[in-house]
Amino acid sequence: MEFDAVLLLSFGGPEGPEQVRPFLENVTRGRGVPPERLDAVAEHYMHFGGVSPINGINRALVTELRAEVGLPVYFGNRNWEPYVEDTVMAMRDNGVKRAAVFATSAWSGYSGCTQYVEDIARARRAAGPDAPELVKLRSYFDHPLFVEMFADAIAAAAATVPKGARLVFTAHSIPVAADRRCGPGLYSRQVAYAASLVAAAAGYDDYDLAWQSRSGPPQVPWLEPDVADHLEMLRAGGVKAVIVCPIGFVADHIEVVWDLDAELRAQAQDAGIALARAATPNADRRFARLARGLIEELRSGGEPARVGGPDSVSGCLAGVNGEPCRPPHCAARETAPQGA
């Protein structure tokens, strides 16, 4: 399978104070999120001048992708400019016939995979009958470069805190019911498996997995433990240093720079705990190499590059033109709002 372009497909984020509320309304449309909740989340963005880091990171990643794949690289978002519909129309007008779609999510499940599939289908409808063929690349939570980037980030973070720091992986929480529908437990098992691979690569036999950034009614159970509660448990157990690795995020979303770098760090300081946050891949050149590798798998028909290990978990394979991915285990809708 040959390609004449690449589409980097992401979540989107505001780039000025006046964009914050419209962006959040896009993210939460149809979910019945009360206005006061939007106001609270908007304040998180205002701490950064109303600018999410995600679009700048993705533009830098586009530059790295162009250098790696040697093809035109386009950039489109679900929830803010550049909208994926506009990007795909531009691809059509430029004569693109088939593009590989690299989504900024390593996971399966509705939020991690199916929403991006829906984005592709919606964008192709907007572009009409001459829309390019769009092939979404497979999930990559167990790709060797994914594991390597996070393992190296943990090593760098460990150098900034006392020896013996406790390693804690985090990922975005989702409702327990949603996690059960998609597998069952597909997303949480993928995260746990990826954490085990990264921990082993970083030289850790013992570590923790916690969840972050939950929302919704308190009576609805979400994946636990919450990272803030887990940090309190570590404090009570006498832990004095922690390395937090946000393995669920391939870039610095607002959940990383606010929920971890601001709120969790403040909690750690109050508790007398030294906290280091491991970097996300962002625009690391290896992330672009990872994407190139996924494209080469489709070109050559070769075996996928995966880090093997006990308790391995299946992921989504490539999907074409917004058709459901294979295996078909991402159809159930989750309700977890993600940030950017």
From Swiss-Prot:
Catalytic activity: Fe-coproporphyrin III + 2 H(+) = coproporphyrin III + Fe(2+)
EC number: 4.99.1.9
GO biological process terms held by the UniProt record: heme biosynthetic process
UniProt cross-references to Pfam families, sorted A to Z: Ferrochelatase (PF00762)
Positions that bind Fe(2+): 172, 255
Lineage top rank: taxon: Bacteria
CC annotations in GO: cytoplasm
Metabolic or biological pathway, per its Swiss-Prot or TrEMBL entry: Porphyrin-containing compound metabolism; protoheme biosynthesis
Keywords attached to this entry: Cytoplasm, Heme biosynthesis, Iron, Lyase, Metal-binding, Porphyrin biosynthesis
Matching InterPro entries: Ferrochelatase (IPR001015), Ferrochelatase_AS (IPR019772), Ferrochelatase_C (IPR033644), Ferrochelatase_N (IPR033659)
GO molecular-function terms, A-Z: ferrochelatase activity; metal ion binding
Cell membrane is among the record's keywords: no
Residues reported in the UniProt entry to bind Fe-coproporphyrin III: 52, 116
Subcellular location: Cytoplasm
NCBIfam families referenced in this protein's UniProt entry, alphabetically: hemH (TIGR00109), PRK00035.2-1 (NF000689)
Function in brief: Involved in coproporphyrin-dependent heme b biosynthesis. Catalyzes the insertion of ferrous iron into coproporphyrin III to form Fe-coproporphyrin III.
Family indicated by similarity: Belongs to the ferrochelatase family.
Protein name: Coproporphyrin III ferrochelatase
The organism of origin for this protein: Mycobacterium ulcerans (strain Agy99)
Gene: cpfC
